[in-house]
A protein has these predicted regions:
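Beta-strand-turn-beta hairpins that frame and shape the catalytic cleft
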Residues: 1-3, 68-77, 117-123
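N-terminal active-site segment of His-dependent metallophosphoesterases
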Residues: 1-48, 58-65
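Conserved beta-sheet core of the metallophosphoesterase superfamily
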Residues: 48-51, 85-129
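Helix-adjacent hinge/juxtasegments
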Residues: 49-100
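A generic structural signal for ordered alpha-helices
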Residues: 6, 16-19, 71, 75, ...
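Active-site neighborhood of phospho(di)ester-bond hydrolases with catalytic His/Asp-centered motifs
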Residues: 5-7, 27-33, 51-56, 77-80, ...
Length: 129
């Protein structure tokens, strides 16, 4: 399954569209900042399932800051990361992911890309967009 993971778009929808056109994903995950960008992307590509979580700039969102989902038989914990203080390091977020049985932790907020693996557990941050 091809999944496009985006985060911290901050109003820049055009680069997200370019990513969708390039990757041709079967699902899109948006990790917050800004949820309205994800909504716009969902309207542009209504046939592609889109899941998201709010970030620290998504004021007034009623959505939960963390979302556990399963795609292609893989359990993924999605979060923006600000509530787990990921700018100080991903350890608290990693602990939360392991506690809920996730295979992959996806987070944003830091604007720094990260791909790390510990055994069969993956930690990933797409950076910005």
């Amino acid at each position: 399954m091809r999944i496009l993971v985006l985060s911290d778009s901050h109003g820049c929808v055009d680069p997200m569209q370019q990513c969708v056109e390039l990757v041709q994903p079967q699902a899109i995950l948006h990790l917050g900042d800004c949820a309205r960008d994800a909504d716009r992307l969902g309207r542009l590509y209504p046939r592609i399932p889109l899941l998201g979580v709010p970030g620290n700039c998504d004021y007034g969102s009623a959505d939960q800051p963390e979302r556990l989902t399963e795609l292609g038989g893989v359990r993924i914990l999605m979060m923006h990361g600000h509530t787990r203080h990921v700018k100080s390091g991903p350890m608290a977020a990693m602990y939360a992911a392991r506690e809920c049985g996730a295979d992959i932790l996806l987070f944003g907020h830091t604007h720094q890309p990260l791909v790390d693996r510990s055994g069969d557990f993956w930690v990933m941050n797409p950076g910005c967009i």
